[in-house]
Amino acid sequence: MSGDNPVGRLVVLAGPSAVGKSTVVHRLREEIEDLYFSVSMTTRAPRPGERDGVDYFFVSPEEFQSKIDAGEMLEWADIHGGLQRSGTPAGPVEAALLAGRPVLVEVDLVGARNVASLKPESETVFLAPPSWEVLVERLTGRGTEPEDVITRRLETAKNELTAQHEFKHVVVNEDVEKAVSDIKEILVGRR
């Protein structure tokens, strides 16, 4: 790409566990040809079917800390009561933005706040459930976490839902097609 390309648009997506972020992100990646999706780094174990370097970079807590110490993370946080750490490697995001590509970063609430603080030009999007009951049903229906983890995730979700007013955009994920369309407009639309 030539040096006179406009800098790409950075969209920061957050929302509670089981709101449908992964589904929406997957669809956006299919529909937006030049989209750069930032692969997060995490200390949690992979879920069935997840691939290292594709879904997440799965690392040890020690390796994660070394990335922080080296200044290689755009944002990071201890999440779910300190059970794990998650964050966004900075280098690939910066390179994609400079190349003029739309960039999608999926993070938790703390990560969204941190990126918005560092990059106030970013478009922050909160993906909300249609109701609390739907969110509980989605989270408990996964069958991938034990009861104590589900309880902790629901506590985290309550906190996250009260912070949605901090975001520039709130998209309710009642209909996946509409949610994808709304976020696609934010990513590549010329508002």
Swiss-Prot record:
It comes from the Bacteria. Pfam families: Guanylate_kin (PF00625). It catalyses: GMP + ATP = GDP + ADP. It is found in: Cytoplasm. GO terms for molecular function: ATP binding; guanylate kinase activity. Keywords: ATP-binding, Cytoplasm, Kinase, Nucleotide-binding, Transferase. Coiled coil: none annotated. Residues 8-188 form the Guanylate kinase-like domain. InterPro entries: GK/Ca_channel_bsu, Guanylate_kin-like_dom, Guanylate_kinase, Guanylate_kinase_CS, P-loop_NTPase. It is an enzyme of class 2 (transferase). The keyword Secreted does not apply. GO terms for cellular component: cytosol. ATP binds at G15, P16, S17, A18, V19, G20, K21, S22. Its EC number is 2.7.4.8. Essential for recycling GMP and indirectly, cGMP. Belongs to the guanylate kinase family. This is Guanylate kinase. It comes from Corynebacterium diphtheriae (strain ATCC 700971 / NCTC 13129 / Biotype gravis).
